[in-house]
């Protein structure tokens, strides 16, 4: 299910068309929002965008992994990872879109 990748430029263009800011102001706005999200995540804060998703940093403890080639046990050091959790609103929107596409692809049943 490959699709188009939405870039910062695409977001800025959308802001330009829908909000009416200049292209430069739109690009600056997109950059500012992304910077604020990144800065909050780096500070260890949870970023919750209602009806979209939650971003947060989670600590992972040290654990033992296994080299798939040799089967040798390898220690995996503790680290922090960023998680993205889609909201239920976004999940439902994705599901509805998927079901609508699936319904369009279904061939019509001929009358018997």
Curated annotation (Swiss-Prot):
Per the record, its GO cellular-component terms are: cytosol
Which InterPro entries does the entry link to?
Answer: Hist_DNA-bd, Histone-like_DNA-bd_CS, IHF-like_DNA-bd_dom_sf, IHF_alpha
Give GO BP annotations, semicolon-separated.
DNA recombination; positive regulation of metabolic process; regulation of DNA-templated transcription; regulation of translation
Spell out the Pfam families in the cross-references.
Bac_DNA_binding (PF00216)
Keywords (alphabetical) are: DNA recombination, DNA-binding, Transcription, Transcription regulation, Translation regulation
SUPFAM superfamilies per the UniProt record, alphabetical: IHF-like DNA-binding proteins (SSF47729)
Tell me the function of this protein: This protein is one of the two subunits of integration host factor, a specific DNA-binding protein that functions in genetic recombination as well as in transcriptional and translational control.
Cite the PANTHER family for this sequence.
Answer: DNA-BINDING PROTEIN HU (PTHR33175), INTEGRATION HOST FACTOR SUBUNIT ALPHA (PTHR33175:SF2)
Family, similarity comment: Belongs to the bacterial histone-like protein family.
Quaternary structure and partners:
Heterodimer of an alpha and a beta chain.
Q: Protein name, please?
A: Integration host factor subunit alpha
Organism whose genome encodes this protein: Allorhizobium ampelinum (strain ATCC BAA-846 / DSM 112012 / S4)
Taxonomic path:
Bacteria, Pseudomonadati, Pseudomonadota, Alphaproteobacteria, Hyphomicrobiales
Encoding gene, per UniProt annotation? ihfA
